[in-house]
């Protein structure tokens, strides 16, 4: 394991006997010692601290894969014996064994450890409140609220009894586990361990929960925050934020097996890809990103599990194929790879890497590149990846990040298995950023705490069946709560086990176009989920939702900026903003997309209607304009072309003209869709869409402020503020008003061409150029 250059120190923890204690305060750290063991409290802020318990003076080393920030400014706190106080928290220390109780500033107990430690593993046992609920834990497909459940976190495929159809078990699916637990009681626990860990959330005893990691360290962060957003934001202060992707990556991604999937590899060829690109453009299907999946690769000794970085012989002109993609406005062209290298016809990658000691000695093929080692990454990039980047590849799909499995693994090797997906995604992400001179991009399947930095996960290989559809939605909700905001899935499912189901395909596509990232891909040879294979009507509906996503790109991109600033995921459960409404805790087939749009996928075959729960506040039907009061269930008709979508009162939704690709033309014309409240503010975000200059403050924000009074509605649009200079916008406005206006003015001038739809109660008018402040005044 030494060759991994992965330094992890594991210290077993024993139960502490009663002994005299001493305390030492140094900087942000408070160390409590006794003859039987020590505990260190490290203050990160007035609402977050780290707890480490060890049997001796030595503390574990700081690893660099999960947590990237260990240095915090001096925190204002006081220590009085076994009491630590900040302006927000009161921490009480108890020993024999060392354990803590945490209360808020008012003295309300949030977290109370009952016991801690064991002989062969570490654990903390915590008192559980009768009405406490638990969320997070990574990309869980089983449920949203884990109260009363047992959760095992280890990067792996689904474990357990194999279903009759397919090979996955949603109860144990762990493509991207994250040891982060969020409580509705205003706190979170981030278990800082890469060792496989277990969470008993009231399964064994309904008045307490525990988290443990056999053989690992008792090392965790306690995070306080009244809102989930504050908890996730603090977690990302430790593990890193999700960076903005290239703007084109918010458009549609197309994956292709090049005409030949598994058992049809010989049919894969570059002509198929060229024709596919042409057909997509001919059919007016908007898309920006494309990658070729496994069958572009020449398979050698290791079969489809190894990567030769050589195209199959049927690809006569790979560079010409990629050039054709760029000529037809594909923004980024990528390739599927594996972490194992293999010898091909021209490249002896495996032999060379092994001779140089750049592969991991896993007791098996010994073919996995040691992505933990900078030297190995540098060699891999220059001698393997460069074979295809020279042809024009601009990103990789890094598949099977779970490949690192040891024979007879020890604790350090078990930890390496969980950290490997991060190192595996980091290498191409950072190198492509340097090569392309713009934002990095990588498309990966597995992850662990910190994977959000590189930057997105897809849900893996789930079947094209109704039984997997709603679990996929749960996975997206859960992974967002776990700090991974960019997430996607194969629209329509991946593996085709049963007869083609147009209803399932379209319902999945509708939801997929309202996911953080939209991917069209599947291995259903020879159709591959191409919309035209499902018929003319299906293609029409596909284009309807694809075009809607492109029209909403100003809203989606602004929501991505919001996530970068505040850590709010693009896709959130209803309880994210309504923690006091327990009705929302079990809802896994509705979610918020951004702050203002509620999406309600249809997850039942041939459903003619579906019930929708509305949290507190007022809502508006995106399709019909119907107003709905909150805190109630209501049923809606769902013909195949309709997925229920609702706007939150106060919403200001910027839209652009639908385009065939993101940069088809400047987004000069901005249409605002507004469901006004008494007062709401929206800030539309813009930048160059490609560079990292936004991290230096080079961006523009246009503030839009809406005010509704008894007899008037006012919209104020300011000039863009910031160092980036966007194109001048021409604004049109659609605003839902219950009464027909008497007159409309813009910038003090009467508007004659306004229209009011009595049925929808919708006013539309042109607000004009936005290169100066625009004030619209509607007298009602």
Identify the function of each model-found stretch:
Residues 61-75, 358, 622-640, 745-767:
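Solvent-exposed beta-strand/loop surfaces of large extracellular or lumenal domains
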Residues 108-642, 647-648:
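Catalytic-domain carbohydrate-binding cleft regions of carbohydrate-active enzymes
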Residues 3, 21-243, 247-249, 255-257, ...:
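N-terminal accessory segment at the very beginning of proteins
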């Amino acid at each position: 394991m030494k060759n991994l250059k992965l330094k992890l120190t594991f210290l077993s923890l024993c139960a502490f006997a009663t002994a005299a204690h001493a305390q030492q305060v140094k900087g942000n750290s408070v160390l409590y010692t006794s003859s039987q063991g020590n505990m260190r409290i490290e203050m990160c802020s007035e609402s977050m601290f780290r707890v480490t318990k060890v049997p001796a003076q030595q503390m574990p080393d700081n690893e660099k894969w999960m947590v990237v920030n260990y240095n915090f400014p001096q925190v204002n706190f006081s220590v009085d014996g076994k009491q630590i106080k900040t302006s927000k928290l009161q921490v009480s220390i108890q020993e024999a064994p060392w354990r803590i109780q945490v209360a808020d500033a008012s003295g309300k107990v949030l977290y109370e450890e009952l016991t801690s430690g064991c002989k062969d593993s570490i654990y903390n046992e915590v008192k559980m409140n009768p009405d406490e609920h638990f969320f997070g834990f990574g990309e869980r497909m089983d449920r949203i609220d884990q109260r009363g459940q047992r959760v095992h976190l280890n990067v792996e495929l689904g474990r357990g009894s194999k279903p009759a159809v397919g090979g996955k078990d949603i109860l144990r699916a762990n493509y991207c586990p994250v040891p982060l637990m969020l409580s509705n009681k205003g706190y979170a626990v981030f278990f800082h361990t890469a060792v496989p860990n277990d969470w008993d959330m009231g399964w064994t005893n309904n008045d307490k929960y525990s988290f443990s990691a056999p053989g690992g360290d008792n090392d965790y962060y306690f995070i306080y925050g009244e809102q989930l957003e504050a908890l996730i934001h603090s977690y990302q202060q430790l593990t890193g934020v999700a960076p903005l992707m290239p703007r084109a990556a918010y458009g549609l991604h197309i994956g292709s097996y090049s005409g030949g999937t598994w058992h049809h590899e010989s049919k894969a060829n570059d002509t198929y890809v060229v024709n596919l690109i042409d057909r997509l453009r001919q059919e007016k299907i908007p898309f920006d990103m494309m990658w070729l999946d496994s069958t572009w690769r020449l398979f050698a000794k290791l079969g489809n599990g190894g990567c030769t970085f050589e195209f199959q012989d049927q690809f006569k002109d790979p560079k010409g194929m990629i050039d054709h993609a760029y000529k037809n406005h594909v923004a980024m062209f990528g390739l599927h790879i594996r972490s194992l290298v293999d010898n091909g016809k021209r490249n002896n990658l495996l032999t060379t890497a092994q001779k140089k000691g750049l592969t991991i000695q896993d007791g098996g093929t010994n073919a996995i590149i040691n992505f933990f080692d900078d030297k190995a990454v540098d060699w891999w990039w220059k001698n393997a990846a460069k074979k295809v980047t020279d042809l024009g590849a601009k990103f990789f799909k890094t598949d099977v990040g779970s490949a690192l499995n040891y024979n007879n693994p020890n604790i350090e090797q078990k930890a390496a298995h969980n950290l490997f997906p991060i190192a595996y995604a980091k290498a191409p992400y950072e190198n492509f950023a340097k090569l392309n001179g713009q934002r990095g991009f990588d498309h990966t399947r597995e992850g662990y705490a910190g994977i959000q930095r590189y930057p997105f996960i897809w849900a893996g290989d789930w079947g094209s069946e109704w039984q997997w559809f709603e679990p996929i939605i749960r996975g997206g909700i859960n992974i967002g709560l776990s700090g991974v905001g960019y997430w996607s899935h194969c629209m329509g499912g991946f593996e085709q086990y049963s007869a083609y189901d147009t209803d399932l395909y379209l319902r999945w596509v509708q939801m997929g176009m309202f996911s953080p990232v939209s991917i069209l891909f599947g291995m259903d040879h020879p159709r591959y989920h191409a919309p035209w294979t499902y018929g003319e009507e299906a293609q029409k509906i596909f284009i309807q939702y694809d075009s809607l996503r492109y029209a909403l790109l100003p809203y989606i991109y602004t929501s991505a900026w919001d996530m970068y600033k505040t850590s709010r995921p693009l896709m959130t459960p209803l309880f994210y903003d309504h923690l006091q409404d327990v009705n929302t805790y079990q809802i896994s087939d509705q979610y918020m997309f951004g702050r203002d749009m509620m999406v309600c996928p249809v997850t039942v075959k041939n459903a003619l209607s579906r019930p929708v729960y509305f949290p507190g506040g007022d809502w508006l039907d995106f399709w019909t304009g119907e107003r709905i009061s909150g805190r109630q269930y209501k049923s809606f008709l769902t013909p195949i072309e309709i997925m229920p979508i609702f706007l939150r009162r106060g919403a200001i939704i910027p839209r652009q003209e639908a385009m065939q690709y993101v940069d088809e033309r400047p987004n000069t014309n901005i249409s605002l869709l507004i469901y006004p409240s008494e007062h709401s503010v929206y800030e539309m975000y813009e930048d160059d869409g490609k560079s990292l200059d936004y991290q230096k403050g080079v961006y523009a924000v246009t503030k839009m402020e809406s005010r509704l009074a008894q007899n008037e509605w006012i919209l104020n649009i300011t000039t863009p503020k910031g160092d980036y200079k966007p194109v001048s916008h021409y604004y049109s406005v659609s605003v839902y008003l219950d009464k027909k206006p008497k007159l409309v003015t813009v910038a003090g001038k009467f508007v004659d061409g306004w229209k009011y739809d009595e049925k929808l109660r919708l006013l539309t008018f042109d607000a004009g150029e936005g290169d100066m402040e625009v004030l619209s005044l509607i007298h009602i």
